[in-house]
Amino acid sequence: MADVKKVVLAYSGGLDTSVILKWLQDTYNCEVVTFTADLGQGEEVEPARAKARAMGVREIYIDDLREEFVRDFVYPMFRANTVYEGEYLLGTSIARPLIAKRLIEIANETGADAISHGATGKGNDQVRFELGAYALKPGVKVIAPWREWDLLSREKLMDYAEKHGIPIERHGKKKSPYSMDANLLHISYEGGVLEDTWTEHEEDMWKWTASPESAPDAPTYIELTYRKGDIVAIDGKEMTPAQVLTELNRVGGINGIGRLDIVENRYVGMKSRGCYETPGGTIMLKAHRAIESITLDREVAHLKDELMPKYASLIYTGYWWSPERLMLQQMIDASQVNVNGVVRLKLYKGNVVVVGRKSDDSLFDANIATFEEDGGAYNQADAAGFIKLNALRMRIAANKGRSLS
């Protein structure tokens, strides 16, 4: 292990990564640089600085990445209407490429020869972090302590921390029974009673959203302005990407929007139950499809829908920096040139209802689509030839006696 002189650690300041910090120092006899990302998780990140300093860390990075996260990762993903396995809005998955990118940048800045993370050997995050790291710095060494050590329970971690003088709170405030991960897009819950797929989640688990039953009895109306597929204003007020998502989380949470309880297929092979709150993302998905419905050509819209599951899978499995994801992104972004306009939504007790959409780039032609007299805008007699031509192959098959059953 003498080949490792300096390691950049993705550090939260919690029990797991604090133990990892000390374990790296002792096991590899190396210098550790800590990196703490503020992705809008809602927790104070500065205590991580004090804890790292107390453990002898000299180079400490605490970065506010909220704007970059939403602008360069969340927004591009939502241009594709991305959903994994029909439901999951990829709140955890989309944060990992940015963390990997910043780990490598700091490694380059500090001359570190390795990076380290606290993802376990059972989950997807180890794959996401490491695929990103290798794509951005092929020769980097990655240290994943959960795949090396025998500290495989919380109690063993606590004992290690006490033995090595790592500041912890064994008898502090009550710890959540769930494993949680949060950023500006979502908060996730795993473990505890959720490991029984028949057991209903507890109401007090949810942190961001009101229950639909207790949400306001009066609906909330909002208008979202789109420019090239991205939201740039709410109710006419221009906002940055992070401000947009923060406000949508707030108003969506009040109205009980964005709760999800699913069993998903992890990349490593197992099924895992997770509960998610994604109020802002749920609103964004509904609104984006609405503005696309009047601005996208039919075949472009259908092609996007065909490509989306593959795009979603690439993000879920950690291939954000792959050539195929980058290729798909160029196609998706090209489709958004005319996705401009305003969507009006009604938020009510867990529901997002589209009640209006308008655009100077709209392909909706009321003169042609009307059920009333159209003044010759559309010749209905043209449909006869259209139908006969499209039926030709089936007519030929029928004349040949081909069976239809």
Swiss-Prot record:
Chain's gene name: argG
Location(s), subcellular: Cytoplasm
Catalyzed chemical reaction(s): L-citrulline + L-aspartate + ATP = 2-(N(omega)-L-arginino)succinate + AMP + diphosphate + H(+)
Pfam families registered for this protein in UniProt: Arginosuc_syn_C (PF20979), Arginosuc_synth (PF00764)
GO biological process, one term: urea cycle
Main enzyme class: ligase
Keywords: Amino-acid biosynthesis, Arginine biosynthesis, ATP-binding, Cytoplasm, Ligase, Nucleotide-binding
Residues at which ATP binds: 10-18, 37, 118
Residues that hold L-aspartate according to the record: 120, 124-125
Gene3D superfamilies: Argininosuccinate synthetase, chain A, domain 2, HUPs, Single helix bin
Major localization class: cytoplasm
Subunit structure: Homotetramer.
GO cellular component: cytoplasm
Molecular function via GO: argininosuccinate synthase activity; ATP binding
Pathway: Amino-acid biosynthesis; L-arginine biosynthesis; L-arginine from L-ornithine and carbamoyl phosphate: step 2/3
Protein name: Argininosuccinate synthase
HAMAP family associated with the record: Arg_succ_synth_type1
Family: Belongs to the argininosuccinate synthase family. Type 1 subfamily.
Binding, L-citrulline: 88, 93, 124, 128, 179, 188, 264, 276
UniProt EC number: 6.3.4.5
InterPro entries: Arginosuc_syn_C (IPR048268), Arginosuc_syn_N (IPR048267), Arginosuc_synth (IPR001518), Arginosuc_synth_CS (IPR018223), Arginosuc_synth_type_1_subfam (IPR023434), AS_cat/multimer_dom_body (IPR024074), Rossmann-like_a/b/a_fold (IPR014729)
